[in-house]
């Protein structure tokens, strides 16, 4: 409701519609969008891979999934610190220590029709990253 009021108050004519739905079960047909933008979503949903699969499903071939998120270190001091902080930040809804780059890479390897275009750390500290992932083809059912 707040977003709809804001669209009206600001006169945002480019916003056609707003909808609330489960990121793991999107109510859109296959191949609906040229771009899917997921800001700080992947680490907040119960089953991130299911959400990533849904984002891929609703993308048209050639479309891009743009993710802005926190990506944890796979190893080293930063990984140690992130794991130590996890009990403190998890009750706040942050599961960032669970989301290393290798988890995204594993999803990409199994997603089939998705390819990484860009993985850019966001300044100043690089704890957040911008991922651009392109859908290369329509998935074929097995």
For every predicted segment, state its role.
Residues 1-25:
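Class I SAM-dependent methyltransferase SAM/SAH-binding core
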Residues 68-124, 129:
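C-terminal alpha-helical "lid/dimerization" subdomain adjacent to the S-adenosyl-L-methionine
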Residues 49-61:
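A short glycine-rich, Lys/Arg-flanked "PGG" loop and its adjoining helix->strand segment in the class I
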Residues 19, 37, 66:
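Conserved Rossmann-like nucleotide-binding pocket used by diverse enzymes
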Residues 34-47:
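A short SAM/SAH-binding and catalytic strip from SAM-dependent methyltransferases
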Residues 11, 46, 60:
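Short conserved AdoMet
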Residues 21-35:
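A short acidic, Gly/Pro-enriched loop at the edge of an enzyme's catalytic core
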Residues 130-142:
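C-terminal lobe and adjacent flexible extensions of AdoMet/dcAdoMet transferase-like proteins
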